[in-house]
């Protein structure tokens, strides 16, 4: 309509000052925002873009001026294309590249920012990107998926070490989109499907990062990617955990009914969603106010 599009969107890049003024007016005391990797290092590796550093510095300074604590997320799914061309998160080299990027972030912002989140919802961009192909890079490849799980976990550990080596006083964690998993019935098939879904959605990253081990149902699939001392690197003394929550999932055993509309995975993973006559958001998420508890 009227040739309108979403290119400009909220225009936070140009209007961040008034946005932060609005935050201050409603007494927000923190602001979690995500860095664009390409804005800081356009090619993913190598030369740093001073204009990108300048923008985030001004954003951070404005937050601090208004007594708003900045919480920086390093990665929110926008991988530089040059790195995807090298294999993306299925490539183990990404673990060192991400650590270098995280180091650049702390060198430039660690003097003013105390809280850093390595990844936002890693289960989303790995499942959607490497299993059902809904998101970039659009693969339907379980082997790449399992490789990406381990590489993201390892990248978190290496980034943690790199950032702490520069400033041991900063706080570092990871943010997950956890969801209660409810079996559709008490049948053994549905119970097993629910355990599988819980493994992939809730535990494939939280368990290695915060417990130091992969879930039992995942270990065989990722074991070929684990090298000596990897698990020690992954299991750091994280300072906090971030939890995002949207809905719960009703799980049933089903090789064909996939989570196309409201979730993820393809027919190679044997579970699906049970359809219920319940209220949904416009994004198709079930409205369950008590699911977070």
Each language-model region and where it sits:
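Active-site region of glycoside hydrolase catalytic domains
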Residues: 1, 24, 43-45, 54-293
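N-terminal structural segment of carbohydrate-active enzymes
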Residues: 1-49, 53, 59-65
